Structure formats: C-alpha cells, structure tokens
Amino acid sequence: MFDMKRQLIPRYAYLPIVVCIVWNTLVYNMTRFFTNKMPHYDFSIKLDSYIPFVSSFVVIYILSYVLWIIGFLVFAKESRSLCNELFAAEFVCKTICLFCFVIIPTTMTRANVPSGGVLNWLTNAVYSLDQPNNLFPSIHCMESWICFRGALRCKKVHPMYSKVWFVLAILICMSTVFVKQHVFVDIIGGIVVAEIGLFLSKKFNLGRVYDVVRYKFIAITKPKKKTNKVVLKK
C-alpha cells in the first residue's frame, strides 16, 4: 500500500501532469512553425512606455517556474477532484492560447539591456532563450493566476498559503512587464483566459475526462483472471 501523505505525486495526478507538460510544449513551441512568416502585432499601449526596465525582477520571472511546480503539486495532492478540475482548466487555457498565438501572433520591442552584472546577464539569457512572440495572453500570468485560484481551494495547507500565492501572482505579473517580456495587455489577457478556463472546467465538469481515460487504461492493461471451467460428467 502507498501512503498518500508520503507520495510527492499521487497516482491519480500522473495523467493530468503528463498531459499538461506535453500540451504546454506543443502549444508554446509548435505554433511558432505556423506563425514564423506571418505578420506579428504589437499590443503596446501608452502605459507601457511609462513602465521602466527593472533588472531585479528577472529573479522573480525565472523563479516562477519553480513556484508553478510547487503550486500545481499542492493542489494535485489536495484531492482527486480538485486535481482533475484545475488541470482540465489548465488544458482549456492552453487551448485558448493556441488559437490566440496562431490567429493573432504578437511581438514587442524589448529593452536594451546594458552589459555587466548578474541581473543583466540573466535578463539577456532569458531574451536569448525565449523569442519575443507568443505573448498574448501571457502564460506567466495565466499559470500564476491558476495557482492562486487553486490555492484558495486548498484546505490541507496553512491559511496564509492562498494569501502568499496572491502576492506571488501579482509579483510574477509585474515581472513580465518590468523585464520587458510582455506588455500590460498580455497580463490582462492571461488572467482573463485563466478565469475562462477555470469557469468552463467547473461548469462542465471537464476533469472527469481524466478519470474516464484513467479507468479505461486500467481496464485494458489489467490482466484478466483465468476461470477454471467445470466439466460435468455424464
């Protein structure tokens, strides 16, 4: 028997997590093959010109990846139903992102980062690894908002957990514009898409799909018991 409290990842969360990773990779990277030669739009508004480049926020921007892993694992361990619901919401959000990335490909003008210093080096590293496209909606903001909304539903953690995640979500959203990886409209788009995904997942109980697939897989792979035939003598 497996002790659920000792498991880092509950068995029921395996499928949602794998689907999440695969779908995220496909949506974010494969869409670029279709939009590479398409015209890209800059959604910058006047407000963006007043937002300065602040290199220290690159630390929060990079740490967000670790924070998401923690956030998703926490609500995955909360319960099967919450795990299924929120991962289904995440799938819906990424699907919306796919259509946005292909239909309205976006770009922006990045900051001229001065050379020298660890923070500037980290920022340039982020710039070199991540092209200035697939910006609207902001996946950074979307994932962070899902983690915050998931934290509100978690009962097995400290009462301060959701408040901490709210602050983290705000800081991560701020980091996207202070590091000049996104514009303000991308933040709004990310939060709105997150709310749409959460609403649709709960409204239509989309998380049940994971249970259906899981049970069918178990039924197919489970070895059948041999039955001994009784031969009746005449």
Regions found by a protein language model. Give the residues of each.
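Membrane-embedded alpha-helical segments of multi-pass membrane proteins
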Residues: 22, 60-67, 139-143, 188-192
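Membrane-interfacial alpha-helical segments at the cytosolic side of multi-pass membrane proteins
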Residues: 69-73, 141-161, 165, 191-201
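N-terminal transmembrane-helix/juxtamembrane module of multi-pass inner/ER membrane proteins
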Residues: 1-67, 114, 123, 226-234
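Alpha-helical transmembrane segments of multipass membrane proteins
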Residues: 30, 72, 98-99, 150, ...
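Interfacial helix-loop-helix junctions of multi-pass membrane proteins
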Residues: 111, 132-136, 171-199
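Aromatic-anchored segments of alpha-helical transmembrane domains
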Residues: 25-26, 94-102, 167-178
